[in-house]
Swiss-Prot record:
This is Nucleoside diphosphate kinase. Keywords: ATP-binding, Cytoplasm, Kinase, Magnesium, Metal-binding, Nucleotide metabolism, Nucleotide-binding, Phosphoprotein, Transferase. HAMAP family: NDP_kinase (MF_00451). It comes from Prochlorococcus marinus (strain MIT 9215). The gene is ndk. Major role in the synthesis of nucleoside triphosphates other than ATP. The ATP gamma phosphate is transferred to the NDP beta phosphate via a ping-pong mechanism, using a phosphorylated active-site intermediate. It is found in: Cytoplasm. Its cofactor is Mg(2+). Pfam families: NDK. Its EC number is 2.7.4.6. ATP binds at residues 11, 59, 87, 93, 104, 114.
């Protein structure tokens, strides 16, 4: 099995609204393996680096303020096709456009409070994982049911 990894963050609104267990459960039920997990209140510097691609956008300041306003649950998930699958589990950025059954479609209402962040590609995933986690914070392990998750 290809050991692709992605970065997922439950934003302060998702933590405050009590969705941590439900969101983790959706990824586990899908068959992905959690290899990194921590809860923290991000510094402004971390938030600015994370969302640096939006630095020139008018909403950048509000986004940084929001992400650093409360606890975030930062995670690294591993599995075959995890980046694309995670994006599908999460749903569209705008909750009103997100399909029912997705995390945002079921739980979010407002684009500025859309519960969760997920890496949008391999390069982004690597950047975000390296930004939020040190190598020693990531756990290499095998699930007892790994042979039942994939043919490879």
């Amino acid at each position: 099995m290809t050991k692709e990894r992605t970065f997922i963050a439950i934003k302060p609104d998702g933590v405050q609204r009590g969705y941590v267990a439900e969101i983790i459960g959706r990824f586990e039920k899908k068959g992905f393996k959690l290899v990194g997990l921590k809860q923290l209140i991000p510094s402004k510097d971390l938030a600015q680096n994370h969302y640096g691609v939006h630095r020139e956008r008018p909403f950048f300041g509000d986004l940084v303020d929001f992400i650093s306003s409360g606890p975030v649950v930062a995670m690294v998930w591993e599995g075959e096709g995890v980046i694309l699958s995670a994006r599908k589990l999460i749903g569209a950025t705008k909750p009103l456009e997100a399909e029912p059954g997705t995390i945002r479609g079921d739980l979010a209402i407002d684009i500025g409070r859309n519960i969760i962040h997920g890496s949008d590609g391999e390069d982004t995933a690597k950047f975000e994982i390296d930004l939020w986690f040190n190598e020693e914070e990531l756990c290499e392990w095998e699930t007892s049911d790994a042979k039942w998750r994939s043919e490879n």
